[in-house]
């Protein structure tokens, strides 16, 4: 029962307490997605921040060529960043650039890191930044030391050279920078081995220059190395001459430094300091040679150079006077150690004087060398002390030297120490010079190997003399080759090598004097000529004999009524001058105008511009008159007089022609006031005087006749002349000069006839006379009869055709065209163009059973206007002469 009660109570209990079931709340898987996204975002953020790198600020003076999100930052050719922003500073004076640097490169962002802009740059010093032409401007840097930094100030220009591993950095100390610039090359044995890196003023107020030597050449820099400046062009003018030193173009523009190093010196350490000398001479590197020198004011210590075989090997380092001896000096030479083998017991040191030499223009170093030492190598033991000898002593002391004396009225610019040349090759030297009241004497030494070039007829000419003359023919100079103009000396002229060498020779001023045998410098006239008017000659004009130069004009002196012309005939040709010599002025050109064309025979240009005189020996008596031309000179005494009423076409110098040959010319034209006429004097060639000067000769002026029909006398278009028809009478010297228009020569002897007509129509003088279309004559002139009702046409028929004119011959006007209209139709005939323009006359003889006799000269015929209708049936038979 008890158990029953307990179970019921429990049951009641549980019935009274109803169980409430509650479910546990859990996070939904959906909320994992935002969490995952957040994690991924955080990772990406940190990745972006990491890849973004370090942000830095660079300040530039200007932003030229810098573009945001485009301009790169490079280091050793690789991109390590990019520009993100570009903006002005607060004062608008500079530009700030914000850039991102890649994380792997952030370690180089230090306090002394340098940034600069790279862009293409072209200058005389070179071309830089070529890679920026393709990719555009970029920013580069040079790593530095110090603390980390993110703000920088850009450099105006980056360093040209950068110190890399193995390169040698050294420092040069100098009083001034000179013409050296950053980036200038450093040379060793003419080979570029480094660059100028930077320069500054150090604490001692000296210029300190940083030099980077490439690692491949660092071993050549020794502790005892010496550096000197080879920048630009170094020139020094002194009594010893002009010392000119020109390096490469790069050294001239940008500057350069060179150095040398002793082979046995230890290698230089990093950051070693060296003195930078102004030049090689100041560096004083070399072997010392003691010398005793002949006294000379042109020697300067530190400047006078030492040469061997035209190569500079040293310099005069010291120079001092010798007590109580003014003739010598003591000094020492610094010689290139590589040339020590030149100085042996039998070597010689010669003091030479290299004067200005235009032949060395291509080598500026030789142009103004001045006085210098020349080392002639010899054999024997090494020697370090020498007595210097002069250049002339070297040749005089040589065995078998030929010594000559040259005499001249003055020195002609030749002086002691100058060379003697043969075919531009040095064969000797002027060793001494003396002056007395008679002139100048030179002692010349000819080297033994060339003494065979000197003979009895050898001539010596001053090569120093630079003979300049200015005249109508321009600037004329006479001298030796260009390199001898200022170098000076004596030239040797050898002809055929006749005879042995003499002890003494004259020294000629120039080649012309040598050729003509002129030994003096003052010329005296050989002969004096007289002329009424001054022709086209001047002082210095040539005198010719058969076109060969034999002299020249010394002077022209005006007198009251004439001019005196002083002439000098060269001594070699004075035998050509005789009592029968006659002189005339040489024409500049001979012009011949003919139907064949214009022939011009010109003299050489110098004669044309300056004039010349010619002479021959065909005269008579002692005639010293200078004639205007050759014709005048040869025609003196052979004169005729021509009289005319009009001088329109007459001129002085007009030629007289016979059968196309010039036989004389008009000498003068004068007006005869009393007789009211013109009188002309004509000079006749003596060879034709007996033919021309005869009674019955006709003289006619030939000038061009221009008409519609053409141009007659075309040969006189440029130069009218006088035509001569010779006579058969006695000798006569006065003639009338005809002014009428001449007929052509083929009709001059034609048979004359007279044609009568009412009107001349289109006829003119010179119109052709035609027979069957062939020209057989011409119209000579027109005139009216006494009543004035008819025109008389005078014609001339060529002699060989005069038999065609018969007693019954008919003449008609052939105007060039004929038109007729009839039952049979229209007939139109034309002639030549000349007939159309100039007109013409045709003739024919009617056909009859008996041929009429030949017409007599001057017979009159009727000139018909129209062509006879029956003319086509005429002339069917031959007419006998």
UniProtKB/Swiss-Prot annotation:
Subcellular location per the Swiss-Prot or TrEMBL entry:
Cell inner membrane
| Signal peptide stretch | none
Pfam entry (one): MlaD
Whether Cell inner membrane counts among this entry's keywords is yes
Report the principal subcellular site.
membrane
Enumerate the UniProt keywords alphabetically.
Cell inner membrane, Cell membrane, Membrane, Transmembrane, Transmembrane helix
User: Does the keyword section mention Ligase?
Assistant: no
Gene Ontology CC entries for this record: plasma membrane
Q: How would you describe this protein's topology in the membrane?
A: Single-pass membrane protein
User: Which InterPro entries does UniProt cross-reference here?
Assistant: Mce/MlaD, PqiA-PqiB_transport
Q: Which GO terms describe its biological process?
A: membrane organization
TM ranges are 30-49
Q: Which family does it belong to?
A: Belongs to the PqiB family.
In Swiss-Prot or TrEMBL terms, this protein is called: Probable intermembrane transport protein HI_1672
């Amino acid at each position: 029962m008890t158990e029953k009660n307990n179970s019921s109570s429990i049951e009641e209990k549980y019935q009274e307490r109803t169980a409430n079931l509650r479910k546990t709340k859990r996070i939904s898987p959906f909320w994992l997605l935002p969490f995952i996204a957040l994690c991924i975002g955080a990772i990406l953020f940190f990745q972006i921040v990491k890849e973004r790198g370090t942000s830095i600020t660079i300040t530039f003076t200007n932003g030229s060529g810098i573009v945001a999100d485009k301009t790169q930052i490079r280091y050793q050719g690789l991109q390590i960043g990019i520009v993100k922003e570009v903006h002005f500073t607060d004062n608008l004076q500079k530009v700030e650039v914000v850039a991102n640097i890649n994380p792997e490169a952030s370690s180089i962002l230090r306090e002394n890191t340098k940034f600069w802009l790279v862009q293409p740059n072209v200058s005389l010093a070179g071309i830089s930044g070529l890679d920026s032409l393709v990719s555009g401007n970029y920013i580069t840097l040079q790593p530095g030391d110090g603390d980390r930094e993110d703000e920088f100030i850009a450099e105006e220009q980056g360093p040209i050279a950068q110190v890399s591993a193995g390169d040698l950095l050294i420092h040069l100390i100098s009083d001034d920078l000179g013409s050296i610039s950053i980036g200038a090359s450093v040379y060793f044995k003419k080979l570029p081995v480094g660059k100028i890196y930077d320069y500054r003023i150090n604490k001692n107020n000296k210029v300190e220059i940083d030099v980077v030597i490439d690692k491949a050449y660092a071993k050549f820099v020794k502790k005892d190395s010496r550096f000197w400046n080879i920048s630009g062009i170094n020139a020094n003018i002194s009594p010893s001459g002009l010392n000119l030193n020109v390096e490469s173009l790069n050294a001239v523009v940008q500057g350069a430094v060179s150095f040398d190093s002793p082979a046995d010196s230890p290698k230089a350490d990093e950051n070693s300091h060296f003195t930078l000398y102004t030049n090689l001479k100041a560096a004083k590197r070399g072997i010392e040679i003691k010398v005793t020198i002949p006294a000379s004011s042109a020697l300067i210590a530190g400047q006078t150079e030492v040469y061997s075989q035209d190569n500079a090997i040293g310099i005069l380092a010291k120079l001092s006077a010798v007590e109580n001896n003014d003739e010598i000096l003591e000094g020492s030479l610094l010689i290139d150690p590589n040339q020590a083998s030149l100085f042996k017991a039998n070597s010689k040191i010669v003091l030479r004087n290299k004067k200005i030499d235009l032949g060395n223009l291509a080598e500026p170093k030789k142009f103004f060398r001045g006085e210098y030492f020349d080392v002639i190598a010899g054999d024997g033991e090494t020697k370090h002390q020498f007595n210097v000898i002069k250049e002339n002593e070297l040749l005089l002391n040589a065995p078998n030297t030929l010594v000559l004396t040259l005499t001249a009225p003055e020195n002609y610019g030749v002086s002691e120490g100058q060379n003697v040349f043969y075919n531009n090759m040095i064969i000797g030297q002027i060793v001494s010079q003396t002056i007395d009241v008679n002139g100048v004497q030179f002692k010349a030494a000819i080297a033994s190997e060339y003494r065979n070039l000197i003979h009895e007829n050898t001539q010596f000419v001053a090569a120093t003399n630079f003979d300049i003359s200015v005249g109508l023919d321009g600037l004329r100079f006479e001298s030796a080759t260009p390199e001898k103009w200022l170098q000076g000396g004596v030239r040797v002229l050898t002809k055929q090598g006749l005879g042995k060498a003499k002890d003494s020779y004259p020294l000629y001023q120039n080649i012309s004097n040598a050729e003509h045998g002129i030994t003096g410098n003052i010329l005296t006239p050989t002969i004096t000529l007289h002329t009424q008017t001054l022709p086209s000659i001047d002082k210095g004009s040539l005198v010719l004999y058969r076109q060969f130069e034999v002299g020249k004009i010394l002077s022209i002196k005006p007198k009251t009524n004439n001019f005196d012309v002083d002439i000098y005939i060269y001594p070699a040709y004075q035998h050509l001058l005789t009592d029968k010599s006659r002189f005339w002025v040489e024409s500049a050109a001979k012009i011949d105008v003919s139907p064949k064309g214009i022939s011009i025979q010109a003299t050489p240009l110098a004669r044309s511009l300056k004039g010349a005189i010619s002479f021959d020996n065909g005269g008579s008596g002692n005639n010293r008159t200078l004639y205007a031309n050759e014709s005048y000179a040869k025609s003196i005494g052979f004169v005729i007089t021509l009289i005319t009423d009009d001088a329109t076409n007459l001129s002085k110098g007009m030629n007289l022609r016979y059968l196309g040959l010039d036989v004389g010319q008009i000498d003068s034209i004068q007006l005869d006031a009393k007789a009211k006429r013109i009188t002309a004097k004509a000079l006749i060639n003596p060879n034709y005087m007996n033919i021309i000067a005869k009674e019955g000769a006709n003289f006619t002026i030939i000038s061009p006749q221009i008409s519609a029909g053409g141009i007659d006398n075309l040969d006189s278009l440029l130069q009218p002349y006088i035509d001569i028809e010779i006579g058969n009478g006695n000798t006569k010297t006065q003639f009338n000069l005809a002014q009428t228009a001449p007929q052509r020569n083929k009709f001059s002897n034609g048979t004359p006839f007279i044609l009568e007509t009412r009107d001349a129509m289109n006829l003119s003088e010179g119109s052709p006379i035609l027979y069957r279309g062939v020209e057989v004559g011409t119209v000579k002139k027109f005139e009216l009869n006494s009543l004035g009702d008819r025109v008389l046409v005078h014609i001339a028929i060529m002699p060989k055709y005069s038999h065609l004119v018969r007693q019954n011959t008919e003449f008609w006007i052939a105007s060039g065209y004929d038109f007729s209209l009839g039952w049979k139709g229209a007939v139109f005939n034309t002639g030549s163009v000349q007939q159309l323009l100039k007109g013409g006359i045709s003739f024919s003889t009617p056909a009859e059973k008996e041929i009429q006799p030949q017409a007599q000269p001057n017979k009159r015929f009727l000139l018909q206007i129209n062509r006879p209708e029956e003319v086509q049936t005429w002339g069917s038979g031959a007419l006998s002469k």
